[in-house]
Amino acid sequence: MPRKGHIAKRDVLPDPLYNSKVVTKLINSIMLDGKRGVAQKICYDAFEIIAEKSGKDAMEVFETAMNNIMPLLEVKARRIGGATYQVPIEVRPERRQTLGIRWMLIAARKRGERSMRERLAGELLDASNNTGAAVKKREDTHKMAEANKAFAHYRY
């Protein structure tokens, strides 16, 4: 934690094709070794695959998938009197988005398809249909929070 006041959040610019900040965050998360062009190509190709397979607008499918992945609750370890409790807390909107993108990419990278664009498209389509590994991760997180509801009074 900084001693000299609050650190300003850096604002990301919307991507050129879809004019969306969430897509920019997705591209930034896909990016490895600063290769933004490669990451953009993967993302946009995945969106084209989604449009082909589903017959719907790719952004619509993406937004549905993100809403199905983003968690509402999570647990945070809190140490009280020598015991560590998993305390359920609500997730801030920005963290919800970050976790959703992170879980989606982890799930996509574990898939069996040949290229990353196919994996990402597959995971987004699955997530928009409320299936897939990323949605399962969200459900597991919610179950964990529900199971530890008794410790909610230890909230920060």
UniProtKB/Swiss-Prot annotation:
List the Gene3D superfamilies. Ribosomal protein S7 domain
Where on the tree of life does the source sit, at the highest rank? Bacteria
Q: Which Pfam families match?
A: Ribosomal_S7 (PF00177)
Q: Which InterPro entries match?
A: Ribosomal_uS7 (IPR000235), Ribosomal_uS7_bac/org-type (IPR005717), Ribosomal_uS7_CS (IPR020606), Ribosomal_uS7_dom (IPR023798), Ribosomal_uS7_dom_sf (IPR036823)
Query: Which GO biological process categories is it annotated with?
Result: ribosomal small subunit assembly; translation
UniProt KW keywords: Ribonucleoprotein, Ribosomal protein, RNA-binding, rRNA-binding, tRNA-binding
Q: What GO molecular-function term can you cite, just one?
A: structural constituent of ribosome
The cellular component terms of Gene Ontology attached to this UniProt record, alphabetical and capped at eight, are: cytosolic small ribosomal subunit; ribosome
Keyword rRNA-binding: yes or no?
yes
Complexes and interactors: Part of the 30S ribosomal subunit. Contacts proteins S9 and S11.
In the record, the note on similarity to other proteins reads:
Belongs to the universal ribosomal protein uS7 family.
What the protein does comes down to: One of the primary rRNA binding proteins, it binds directly to 16S rRNA where it nucleates assembly of the head domain of the 30S subunit. Is located at the subunit interface close to the decoding center, probably blocks exit of the E-site tRNA.
Q: Which NCBIfam families match?
A: rpsG_bact (TIGR01029)
Q: This protein is called what?
A: Small ribosomal subunit protein uS7
Question: Which species is the source of this protein?
Answer: Clostridium botulinum (strain Hall / ATCC 3502 / NCTC 13319 / Type A)
Gene coding for it: rpsG
